[in-house]
């Protein structure tokens, strides 16, 4: 599986983005429905706004797709991402786009609107799952039901773009679905062994997974939302979070290892002093070495080790 990482040389100011997209919009109708590879095999140009979606596209489409991932760096804060000229170019040329929605990757909507194409199929995961626009947690890939739905939708879209390979894409989606079984088993085992395990977090990056395993997140939603949105939590919220560690009310502390600041460092220090294991969750799929399935299994096993053996995992 090969997924191209799109890295812009520099952030593109809003005005310049509009100018570039205006040019792209004129050129867009000339893009062919399929791209020829060096071997002569025609491949569909596809884009995943996030690396995890690009990875799933690649698994479904196999040799018939050329996939690019936009947000793909597990060492940066995805909330600070800015589109570069290269990003606009790649998205404008795509025939299939998978994006998260819920405002997480709104730059994609701007690019698509400025470079419309009747050939492009856009899968907005928020809309695919029927979620309202005011849904509070955009980290949809941690929800076990998300990627099977994405895989089916990707297979259908690819089948429309290349009808001759529709059966191949359907088989890819079915294989992907089966490959999630070890993760779902790990979730079920964790839920059965540690029902309602009390945990604390910095933000909701892994909240869907915590819900799936039946854990009780005692961190106030206000603190999670403030941290996610780059807002300083109130002193009352911080004091309550501190008490979760000092009074040993939680068994694990989970934090977003891509977004750490002095407050996160303070929580980590408190957890360590009180003997509470910590788990660093990734907001972006770590690469190389992982696909979506192995990433989710690794995160789930990190939580299991923390609960069962009091072992911390801060890096995959």
Q: Model-derived features: where do they sit?
A:
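Bacterial N-terminal signal peptides
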Residues: 15-29
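Extracytoplasmic metal-acquisition and chelation regions
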Residues: 29-316
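Feature targets compositionally biased, intrinsically disordered low-complexity regions
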Residues: 7, 14-17, 39, 171
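N-terminal secretory signal peptides that target proteins for export/translocation
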Residues: 1-9
């Amino acid at each position: 599986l090969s997924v191209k990482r799109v890295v812009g040389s520099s952030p593109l100011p809003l005005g310049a983005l509009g100018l570039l997209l205006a040019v792209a919009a004129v050129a867009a109708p000339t893009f062919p429905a399929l791209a020829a590879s060096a071997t002569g095999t025609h491949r569909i140009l596809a884009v995943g706004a996030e690396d995890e979606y690009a990875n799933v596209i690649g698994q479904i489409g196999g040799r018939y797709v050329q996939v690019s991932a936009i947000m793909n760096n597990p060492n940066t804060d995805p909330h600070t991402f800015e589109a570069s000229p290269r990003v606009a170019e790649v998205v404008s040329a795509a025939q299939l786009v998978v994006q998260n929605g819920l405002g997480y990757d709104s730059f994609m909507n701007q690019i698509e609107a400025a470079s419309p194409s009747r050939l492009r199929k856009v899968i907005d995961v928020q809309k695919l799952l029927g979620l309202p626009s005011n849904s509070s947690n955009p980290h949809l890939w941690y929800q076990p039901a998300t990627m099977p739905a994405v895989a089916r939708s990707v297979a259908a879209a690819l089948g429309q773009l290349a009808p001759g390979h529709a059966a191949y894409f359907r088989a890819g989606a079915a294989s992907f679905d089966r490959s999630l079984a070890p993760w779902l088993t790990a979730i079920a085992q964790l839920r059965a062994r540690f029902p309602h395990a009390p945990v604390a977090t910095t933000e909701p990056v892994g909240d869907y997974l915590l819900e799936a395993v039946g854990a009780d997140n005692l961190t106030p939603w206000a603190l999670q939302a403030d941290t996610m949105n780059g807002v300083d939590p109130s002193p009352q919220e911080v004091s309550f979070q501190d008490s979760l560690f000092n009074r040993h009310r939680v068994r694990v502390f989970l934090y977003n290892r891509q977004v750490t600041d002095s407050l996160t460092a303070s929580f980590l220090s408190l957890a360590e002093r009180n003997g509470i294991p910590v788990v660093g969750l990734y907001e972006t799929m770590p690469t190389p070495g992982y696909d979506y399935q192995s990433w989710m299994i690794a995160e789930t096993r990190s939580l299991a080790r923390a609960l069962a053996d009091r072992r911390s995992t801060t890096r995959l």
